[in-house]
Every structure is written in C-alpha cells, then in structure tokens.
Curated annotation (Swiss-Prot):
Highest taxon listed in the record's lineage: Bacteria
Annotated positions of the N5-methylglutamine modification: Q235
A GO CC annotation given for this chain: cytoplasm
Localisation: Cytoplasm
SUPFAM superfamilies for this protein: Release factor
Protein biosynthesis in keyword set: yes
GO MF terms, alphabetically ordered: translation release factor activity, codon specific
Gene name as annotated: prfA
Processing after translation: Methylated by PrmC. Methylation increases the termination efficiency of RF1.
Protein source organism: Histophilus somni (strain 2336)
Protein name: Peptide chain release factor 1
Record's keyword terms, sorted: Cytoplasm, Methylation, Protein biosynthesis
InterPro entries: PCRF, Pep_chain_release_fac_I, Pep_chain_release_fac_I_sf, Prokaryotic/Mito_RF, RF-1
Job of this protein: Peptide chain release factor 1 directs the termination of translation in response to the peptide chain termination codons UAG and UAA.
Family under the similarity heading: Belongs to the prokaryotic/mitochondrial release factor family.
Length: 360
C-alpha cells in the first residue's frame, strides 16, 4: 500500500482516538449539537479504523511467522499461514480503498421517492403501484419508515404518480441509483389474446436536505394553489381545501401534497420536496450534466428511457446499466432488491477507484 495512503489512515486513526476522548468530556456531553456531530464523525470512521487495524495485525503476523521458516517442523505451517495472511491483506487493502473514497454527504439523509406512470396507459399505472409495493417492502426489511406525501391514483389500480418520503439511516445512499426508467413486459389481466404488453414507469430519488442546506427560495417565485384532497376516481375525501400545489415559477417545478388534513402541514411538506428538487437541479447543473435536470432524474416515461426491465413471462429482471440479470422476479417484486442495488453501488465504487487511479 502507498505510503501516502498509510499516512492518511494513521491520521484517521488518531482522529478516531481523539473523538473517543472528546465524547467522554462533560462539556461535549452537555452540548447536544457538538455531541451529535462528534458521534456521527466517530461512527463514520469506525469501519476504516477497524479495517486498518486488521491490516496492521496481518502485516505484523507475517513478520512474526517468517521467523518460523527456519524451523523444519514449523516451516510448512508457517508458509501456509503467510500465504493466507497475504490474501487477507490484499482483501483488506481493496476494502480500505473503497472506505477512503470521497463520501457523498447526502448518502446518510432520508429520501424522497417519486414514481410516475409513463407509456402504457392503465398497465403503467398498475406497474407504478407494483413498484411502490416493492420499495415499501424493501424499506420494511431495512426498518425504514415510508410516508406517503401525494398519491394520484389510477382508476384501474395503482398510481399515475406517487411521492413518498423514506425515513431511515442511509436511505438516499441505498436508493439513489434507482432513479431512471423502469420497464415491465407482461400480459395484462384485461388482455384476452394473451399478448405481452410493454409499459414504463419512471423513478426519481432525491435526498431530504436539512434546513441549513436547503436553497433559499424567494416567496415571490412561488405560486401556491389549494384544493380538496381526492381519492381514486376524483372522489373528495374531505371537505376543506387542505391539499396544496406549489409551482416554482423560475424552473417550472410543480409539487403537490395532500396527505395531511392540515393545509399548513401539506404546505410545509411540499416546500421541503420543492427545495430538494431545486437543490438537485442546481447540483446537476454545476456538474455540467443535462440542463433539464428534472427530465434527467425522472426521464420522459418513454420505453427507450430504461435502466431496468421486469419480464414476467421469463421471470427475470435485467439491469441494463451493468448487464445484470436475475431470475427471481417474484422475490424482487416482494422487496428483495439488495441483489440489484449492491452490484450498482459496487460498480460505482469501481468507477470512482478507476478515476482516482487516473488522477494519481
């Protein structure tokens, strides 16, 4: 391992020890903000410090074991142990490289998840409902909490659009690569000829930003409309104008929220979603991504805009970004999607490592 990396790891280890001492001081314990910040930093360093300690132990173990090579009775055992330790060192170094990659500060935040039906009519709406159920089951398995902010139900079941907030540790980091076009191929229940139909939905995932990181929004840039909350088929579910629609005039971004009975609560939630969308758009613009960030995140709902295909006749799910196919569609639709999410995260980390190698 490079001397510069070892030096960085040593400084992180020292910082970890310093934080451990600070967290025991009464002045820090009595300052909630400071205690929370130090605790978070301490927890973030935990994995890299443990892995570095393991790496050090393995190197020391090799040095000690090499002393046994001159002993005929111990030589074979020593050679085997050295070989095993070298393999473990290689694994530890790979893990340390990943742990040292620049962290996306948004990864630890809650996330807004938006699912929108695209091409395919009623079947696209039904599939949007299936995706919502899939993500809800996944969230349940992670002990995350799902809060529906706005749901525009489809007459045949499912949703034209649904926006939810997923609360939990590291939600955005796990779900952010779900943004994009999701395509389904199956025979609809209403199809009498048994023909396979293709429909599409789009998914957008955005971090819920803390108040101090939210972009400033000029109230004069907003148009706020109120209306009555409605259920499926346009039926009114209450008699007051509690639902809120906010339009950000400069960007044209529109957010609706009708989950709460209180207009003030719906407005607060809608403003939070709006702030996240504006921040996401600005982040993408600064990164010189597509100018139309909302379109980039949500896609157009067109069949060609796809990251993943769910093929029911063949019982398979294919992620087109990394050419990954799994033949456990039923399990996936029941929320077992780690085997789809983790390979994407691993691929992203590999890309980051390659980029760092090129820079070095």
């Amino acid at each position: 391992m490079k001397a510069s990396i070892i030096s960085k790891l040593e400084s992180l280890k020292e910082r970890h020890e310093e934080l451990e001492a600070l967290l025991g001081e009464s002045s820090v314990i009595n300052d909630q903000d400071k205690f929370r910040a130090y605790s978070k930093e301490y927890a973030q360093l935990e994995d890299v410090v443990k892995c570095f300690a393991r790496w050090n132990w393995l190197n020391n173990n090799i040095e000690e074991t090499q002393l046994l090579l001159d002993d005929p009775d111990m030589k074979e055992m020593a050679e085997l142990e050295i070989e095993e330790s070298k393999a473990e060192i290689e694994n530890a170094e790979q893990q340390l490289q990943i742990l040292l990659l620049p962290k996306d500060p948004n990864d630890e935040y809650n996330a807004y998840l938006e699912i929108r039906a695209g091409t395919g009519g009623d079947e696209a709406g039904i599939f949007a409902g299936d995706l919502f159920r899939m993500y809800s089951r996944y969230a349940e398995s992670k002990r995350w909490r799902v809060e529906v902010l706005n749901a525009n139900e489809s007459e045949q079941g499912g949703y034209k659009e649904i926006i939810v907030k997923v609360n939990g540790e590291g939600v955005y980091g796990q779900l952010k690569f779900e943004s994009g076009g999701h395509r389904v191929q199956r025979v609809p229940k209403t199809e009498s000829q048994g023909r396979i139909h293709t429909s599409a939905c789009t998914v957008a995932v955005m971090p819920e930003l803390p108040e101090n990181e939210m972009p400033e929004i000029n109230p004069s840039d907003l148009r706020i409309d109120t209306y009555r909350s409605s259920g499926a088929g346009g039926q009114h579910v209450n008699t007051t104008d509690s639902a809120v629609r906010i339009t950000h005039i400069p960007t044209g971004i529109v957010v609706e929220c009708q989950d709460e009975r209180s207009q003030h609560k719906n407005k607060a939630k809608a403003l939070s979603v709006l702030a996240s969308r504006i921040a996401q758009a600005e982040q993408e613009r600064q990164a010189q991504a597509q100018a139309d960030t909302r379109r980039n995140l949500l896609g157009s709902g067109d069949r060609s805009d796809k990251i993943r295909t769910y093929n029911y006749p063949q019982g398979r799910v294919t992620d087109h970004r990394i050419n990954l196919t799994v033949y456990r569609l039923d399990e996936v639709m029941n929320g077992k999607i780690d085997e789809l999410i983790q390979p994407i995260i691993t691929e992203y980390q590999a890309d980051q490592l390659a980029m760092l190698s090129e820079q070095n």
